[in-house]
Amino acid sequence: MLMGQYEHTIDAKGRVIIPAKFREELGEKFVLTKGLDNCLFVYSLEEWKNIEAKLKTLPLTKKDARAFTRFFLAGAVECEIDKQGRILIPANLREHAKIEKDVIFIGVSTRVEIWSKEVWEEYSNNTDVSFEEIAEHLDDLNI
């Protein structure tokens, strides 16, 4: 399970070190794509196959399903970790996530999220509801 929070700095070429704990779980190759809330999602190749299978079941007749699939897949790239434990985040994905220098990696069960430090701090400090309120709403889902 992917969990925890780590901070790293992106270099001038757009490369960033993937935390060692996440490298163990993700493997040498994985998929990086546009995520929700102005972050990036990282999936192991195995988990990406599960995501692809779910996307294939979305009805082509639904406008939202087509739009989501396009958004999600158009930004997807397969990444390989270099000898220094880094990946290159393409410019279009850095732009989507507003990543310029400092990044936050967050383990979220089956994926890693990569956030601009500034965007993460704003998101986590300005959430309209508290953690307790969110947990209360999820109680209805037996979580």
From Swiss-Prot:
Q: Which GO terms describe its molecular function?
A: DNA-binding transcription factor activity; transcription cis-regulatory region binding
Q: Which domain of life is it from?
A: Bacteria
Known PROSITE patterns for this protein? SPOVT_ABRB (PS51740)
Q: Cellular location of this protein?
A: Cytoplasm, Nucleoid
For this protein, the record's InterPro entries field holds: MraZ, MraZ_C, MraZ_dom, MraZ_N, MraZ_sf, SpoVT-AbrB_dom, SpoVT-AbrB_sf
Stretches assigned to the SpoVT-AbrB domain: 5-47, 76-119
* Protein name, as recorded: Transcriptional regulator MraZ
Source species: Thermoanaerobacter sp. (strain X514)
**What is the gene name?**
mraZ
